[in-house]
């Protein structure tokens, strides 16, 4: 897509991971000395070029790891004022994460923390990431009893750590020989807009196939409908 091509003017495909139809992770660590820019300056440069080329206003989250970058965009950026063009760029490191988000609620706002997990945590008096971090100091074994293997990543996230980087994501090999792309829409879409979404998802899959040097003979499309709007 045009937005993806804009990113490629600044970074290599090896340092970009399309996370969803409208979101990517970009590791700019090695590019900052080359461009003589801070992470904020480089993000702003790319965001403004996207705006100029497409008319689309992007939001960016900057973090010292993937998890913090995701939260900077998902949570922090939503609560800061936009500039004159509607652009929001937020930043987090481990210390600012603990200061700004350890008391944030609900826990479902945090990446990879679903309602089922939150329900289990709240049953044990854990309502915030700060609660979870403090509980883990002396109750790590108990968290594994409550959450199973998921406790490891949640404890890391509670402290603002993320052991997985771009290289690990790129080298991950799933047990099944397939790739997929999903999108949950926030409201009902008419046919013409839905077709555009499907086309954009197909383009993302095309980029991923090309990057992995793969070909396919089969494509499956699944569409779900919410009952309320189907009945209309």
Residue ranges of predicted features:
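Gly/Gly-Pro- and Ser/Thr-rich, intrinsically disordered tail segments characteristic of DNA damage-repair
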Residues: 1-156, 166
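DNA-contacting surface of Y-family translesion DNA polymerases
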Residues: 109, 119-232
């Amino acid at each position: 897509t045009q937005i993806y091509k804009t990113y490629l003017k600044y970074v290599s495909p090896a340092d970009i991971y399309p996370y969803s139809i409208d979101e990517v992770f970009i590791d700019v660590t090695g590019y900052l000395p080359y461009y003589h820019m801070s992470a904020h300056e480089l993000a702003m440069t790319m965001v403004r070029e996207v705006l100029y080329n497409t008319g689309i206003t992007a939001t960016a989250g900057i973090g010292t790891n993937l998890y913090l970058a995701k939260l900077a965009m998902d949570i922090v950026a939503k609560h800061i004022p936009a500039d004159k063009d509607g652009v929001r760029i937020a930043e987090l490191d481990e210390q600012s994460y603990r200061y700004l988000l350890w008391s944030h609620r609900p826990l479902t706002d945090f990446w990879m923390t679903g309602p089922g997990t939150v329900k289990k945590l709240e049953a044990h008096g854990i309502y915030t990431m700060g609660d979870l971090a403090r509980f883990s100091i002396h109750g790590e074994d108990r968290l594994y009893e409550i959450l199973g293997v998921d406790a490891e990543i949640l404890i890391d996230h509670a402290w603002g750590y993320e052991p997985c980087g771009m290289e690990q994501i790129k080298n991950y090999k799933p047990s099944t020989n397939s790739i997929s792309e999903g999108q949950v829409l926030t409201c009902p879409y008419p046919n013409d807009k839905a077709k555009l979404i499907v086309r954009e998802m197909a383009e993302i899959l095309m980029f991923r196939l090309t990057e992995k040097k793969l070909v396919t003979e089969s494509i499956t499309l699944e569409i779900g409908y919410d009952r309320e709007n189907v009945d209309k």
